Each structure stands twice: as structure tokens, then as C-alpha cells.
């Protein structure tokens, strides 16, 4: 399996810290876990299933054009949804992809590589952020992909300067994806949907726009969550936008790629209390 390319993280700050309350994990659905043992169990228990995703012919052609012209296809998600890794799996299979870029801390690369080579998942502080970008389902799907054949995995979230703007952070993420690109390899790049727009937004210049300026023809698939729940530091609900009886489909809407997920469910997310930094 190819080795990840990752940049070294800067040394941690020596500022004093104080404890914060433990995250509350619901007793019934247990959407977050606070121990490595519990996370191991959640990964092992995750049921990998084939999604019944209908890909309309025009959308299929548009996504393939993006991959053919730019070697990239973006997927904009809301973190903390159980179905997200299954959608990643479905899209990679549909387009024959073996390269995946995730908005995960790049310092996790050795931990994830070791896990994908068959070793137990090692503990690491960056696993426990709790925003939902890392879930039990992701680890289960990655393990399946790695077992099936070569998997090129890029983790592109890294250290930022204290004075960096939102746009500068996104520019750095785009640069990491491009630096890790292997000629001839086509990659699905997944991030929170604030970062995947290929044009400027009210937040600034997102990662997707930076990539599109360097890779003409790049397209974004944006997931629309029709309702249901997700985990982002705590249980949250989507506003109802699509009826639960609607079809899961990838289609073109006003020239843009859209993916409807009628009902979302909470992912199992690793989360531990993060120390709050005090001013020096």
C-alpha cells in the first residue's frame, strides 16, 4: 500500500490548560465514544452495506469529466453522519477510484496506515476531536478498501498559523492535496461542505475554489441531507428538506452535482474532552 505523504506538525503549545466537562454520549444510540476499546468495538460492529444510490446518466458523465480533466472529484459533506463513509465507498466503486483524500489531521497518517496494515488502532490525541469527520464507519470502510487492493490515502488538514484567515487555511489544505497527488491517479477529496465549493463564498476563498483554479474542470458533489440526525460535538438534527420516501440519487441541478440522502443517522464519533487554553 502506498505510503502517505504528510507534513510534520509543529510542537504543541506549552500554555497552561484546564479540564472541561466530559462529552455526553446518549445511552441508546451511543453516537460518541470516549475510550479506545469502545471505538475498536464500534469499528468492528459497523455494518458495511451497499447503498441503493441511483446515479443519473448526466451526473455520471459530469463526474467522469471532472476526474478526466482534473484528476479530482470533490465531495462536500456535513460531518457526523453514519452514511457518509458508505457514500464515499459507493462513489469510489462507481468511478473505479483507489485514491481518497480526507479532511483529517495529517499527523494521524502513521496511525491510520498502521491500522490499515492490520495493526490495532493506536491511541492519538487527534482521534478525539468529536466534530464527526472521523467516525467508526470511516475506519471500517477504509479497512475494507485497503484489504481489497492498493489504497492511496491523503490526510490534508494540518497546522495553521495563529494569524491565518479562513481562506489561508483552505489554501493550505488545497496545497496539501496537490502536493500529494500522484500523476495518473484520480482522487475523491472529501471535506466539510463549507470547503468544497469551487467558487468564492461569504466565508472567503474555499479549498475547492483554490483547487479549481489549478485543476480546470473540477466538480463538486454536494450532499443534501433531507432530514435525520448527526453528531457534531453533540447530537444535532437536520431540518426536513426531503421526504423520507425520496430516492437516494446523484444528479445534475443547474449544472452542479447534487446527491440527495433522504434520511441521515448519527455516526459513532470518537470524542474526549479537549483542554481549553488560557491566555498566557
Language-model segment annotations:
Residues 2-280:
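Compositional signal for N-terminal targeting/processing segments
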Amino acid at each position: 500500500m502506498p505510503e502517505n505523504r504528510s507534513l510534520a506538525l509543529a510542537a504543541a503549545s506549552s500554555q497552561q490548560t484546564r479540564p472541561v466537562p466530559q462529552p455526553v454520549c446518549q445511552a441508546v444510540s451511543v453516537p460518541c465514544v470516549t475510550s479506545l476499546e469502545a471505538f475498536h468495538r464500534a469499528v468492528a460492529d459497523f455494518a458495511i452495506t451497499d447503498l441503493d444510490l441511483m446515479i443519473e446518466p448526466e451526473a455520471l458523465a459530469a463526474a467522469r469529466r471532472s476526474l478526466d480533466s482534473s484528476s479530482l472529484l470533490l465531495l462536500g459533506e456535513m460531518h457526523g453522519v453514519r452514511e457518509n463513509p458508505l457514500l464515499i465507498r459507493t462513489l469510489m466503486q462507481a468511478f473505479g477510484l483507489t485514491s481518497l483524500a480526507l479532511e483529517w489531521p495529517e499527523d494521524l497518517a502513521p496511525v491510520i496506515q498502521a491500522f490499515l496494515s492490520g495493526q490495532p488502532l493506536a491511541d492519538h490525541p487527534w482521534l478525539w476531536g468529536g466534530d464527526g469527520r472521523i467516525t467508526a464507519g470511516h475506519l471500517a470502510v477504509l479497512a475494507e478498501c485497503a484489504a481489497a487492493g492498493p489504497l492511496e490515502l491523503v490526510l490534508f488538514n494540518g497546522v495553521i498559523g495563529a494569524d491565518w484567515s479562513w481562506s489561508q487555511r483552505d489554501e493550505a489544505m488545497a496545497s496539501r492535496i496537490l502536493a500529494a497527488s500522484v500523476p495518473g491517479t484520480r482522487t475523491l477529496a472529501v471535506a466539510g461542505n463549507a470547503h468544497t465549493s469551487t467558487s468564492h463564498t461569504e466565508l472567503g476563498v474555499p479549498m475547492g475554489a483554490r483547487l479549481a483554479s489549478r485543476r480546470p474542470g473540477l466538480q463538486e458533489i454536494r450532499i443534501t441531507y433531507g432530514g435525520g440526525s448527526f453528531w457534531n460535538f453533540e447530537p444535532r438534527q437536520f431540518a426536513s428538506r426531503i421526504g423520507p420516501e425520496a430516492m437516494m440519487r446523484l444528479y445534475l441541478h443547474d449544472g452542479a452535482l447534487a446527491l440527495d440522502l433522504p434520511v441521515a443517522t448519527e455516526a459513532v464519533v470518537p470524542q474526549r474532552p479537549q483542554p481549553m487554553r488560557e491566555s498566557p
